[in-house]
């Protein structure tokens, strides 16, 4: 019995998603496979990918430009949330998955499909992100996961595709698995599976090495309005152009490389290489502006919730209730995050050297140690007495207990 009649397949042009097309038809009895490839600013020429799907047996091969919503609806909220999974990874790949899932569901409705499919394997994070997102948006649609179920090794998958005339894009010279979009690149597999092997320079494309970076530093000014980046060096840019320019500037100075051991959703550790120059630069600038414009208790609370926000997105819960609630809190905090931050880029580093805001909570007359100081130093004694009272009472009780044995 056929698993489904008409399926919309998330398609990248890679080995797994290409093999999914004949596999769905010949092994699972699917009558019609419609593929969808998302343009997320990865820079690939998508016409060959579209044709490749047709050659593999797809009845329709669709390509959609999702760059603008990717930045405005997914990347910019992540910047506001200072989203860094495990304190480092800015979710460049994870942010794309709920958007692709949403578009898959929309296409399925438009063409009358009874299922959607993806080529994610059973060890990765993306299977979780797609399955959970689709289940939230369209619980009536089946989600077919051939790569998770077919039980073939990488070599066997390639051989299966060759039976149906599919060429393999992976050679011995380039054994890496690469995912890319406008926000960055993720690189894994091959020699990188040994966590003690230094990544060769050939795996990087968006950033130069620190050795090849300019000897002279460059100052960059980033402007924000309500927590959203709006300008670079005084020039207002649309969201997509701003990300491109941030990538260019940071990448040209070797900033934005990550080499980390990451805890996947499925419980294993993986070694990941990331290039995310612009996104990391913007998050760093945004964090600094918040330190100037948010009250201390709000800032501390937000820093705690940012980690949870990043965990939720990484774990595929973009459309979940907790993230929705956190979005409301973050939105409220951003009303006063207005101003600019100056950052010095130099040979792999990005150092904040200045920040300014009309909503600044920094009061020079209170902070100065000069003659203009308006802080009432005499008030400190009473404050410290009350502040330290609980500690003194606890210490006294501890001494009494010790005295009586």
Curated annotation (Swiss-Prot):
A Gene Ontology term for the protein's cellular component: cytoplasm
PROSITE patterns: ARGININOSUCCIN_SYN_1, ARGININOSUCCIN_SYN_2
Keyword NADP included in the entry's annotation: no
This enzyme's EC code(s): 6.3.4.5
InterPro entries: Arginosuc_syn_C (IPR048268), Arginosuc_syn_N (IPR048267), Arginosuc_synth (IPR001518), Arginosuc_synth_CS (IPR018223), Arginosuc_synth_type_1_subfam (IPR023434), AS_cat/multimer_dom_body (IPR024074), Rossmann-like_a/b/a_fold (IPR014729)
Gene3D superfamilies per record: Argininosuccinate synthetase, chain A, domain 2 (3.90.1260.10), HUPs (3.40.50.620), Single helix bin (1.20.5.470)
Enzyme class: ligase
Binding residues annotated for L-citrulline, in chain numbering: 89, 125, 129, 177, 186, 262, 274
Binding site for L-aspartate: 121, 125-126
Localization annotation: Cytoplasm
Pfam families in the record: Arginosuc_syn_C, Arginosuc_synth
Pathway the protein contributes to: Amino-acid biosynthesis; L-arginine biosynthesis; L-arginine from L-ornithine and carbamoyl phosphate: step 2/3
PANTHER family: ARGININOSUCCINATE SYNTHASE (PTHR11587:SF2)
Name of the protein described by the UniProt record: Argininosuccinate synthase
Organism ancestry: Bacteria, Bacillati, Cyanobacteriota, Cyanophyceae, Synechococcales
């Amino acid at each position: 019995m056929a698993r489904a009649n008409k399926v919309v397949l998330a398609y990248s042009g890679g080995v797994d998603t290409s093999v999914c097309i004949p596999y769905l038809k010949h092994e699972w009895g699917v009558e019609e496979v419609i593929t969808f490839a998302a343009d997320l600013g990865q820079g690939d020429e998508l016409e060959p990918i579209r044709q490749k799907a047709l050659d593999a047996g797809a009845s329709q091969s669709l390509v959609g430009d999702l760059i603008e919503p990717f930045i405005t609806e997914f990347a910019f909220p992540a910047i506001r949330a200072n989203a860094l999974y495990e304190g480092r990874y800015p979710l460049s790949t994870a942010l794309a998955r709920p958007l692709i899932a949403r578009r898959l569901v929309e296409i399925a409705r438009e063409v009358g499909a009874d299922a959607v499919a993806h080529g994610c394997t059973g060890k990765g994070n993306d299977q979780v992100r797609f399955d959970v997102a689709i289940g939230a948006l369209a619980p009536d649609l089946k989600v077919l996961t051939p790569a998770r179920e077919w039980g073939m090794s990488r070599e066997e998958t390639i051989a299966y595709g060759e039976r149906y005339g599919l060429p393999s894009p992976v050679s011995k010279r380039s054994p890496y698995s690469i995912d890319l979009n406008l926000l960055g690149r993720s690189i894994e597999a091959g020699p990188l599976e040994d966590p003690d092997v230094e990544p060769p320079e050939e795996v990087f494309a968006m950033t130069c090495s620190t050795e090849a970076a300019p000897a002279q530093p460059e100052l960059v000014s980033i402007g924000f309005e309500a927590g959203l980046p709006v300008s670079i060096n005084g020039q207002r840019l649309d969201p997509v152009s701003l990300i491109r320019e941030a990538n260019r500037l940071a990448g040209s100075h070797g900033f934005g490389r990550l080499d980390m051991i990451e805890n996947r959703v499925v419980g294993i550790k993986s070694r990941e290489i990331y290039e995310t120059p612009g996104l990391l630069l913007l998050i760093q600038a945004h964090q600094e502006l918040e330190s100037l414009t948010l009250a201390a208790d709000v800032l501390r609370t937000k820093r705690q919730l940012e980690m949870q926000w990043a965990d939720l997105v990484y774990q595929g819960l973009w459309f979940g209730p907790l993230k929705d609630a956190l979005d409301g809190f973050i939105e409220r905090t951003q009303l006063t995050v207005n101003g600019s931050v100056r950052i010095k880029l130099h040979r792999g580093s990005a150092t904040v050297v200045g920040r300014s805001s009309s909503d600044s909570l920094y009061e020079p007359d209170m902070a100065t140690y000069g003659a203009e100081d308006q802080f009432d130093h005499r008030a400190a004694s009473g404050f410290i007495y009350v502040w330290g009272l609980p500690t003194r009472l606890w210490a006294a009780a501890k001494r009494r207990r010790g005295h009586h044995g």
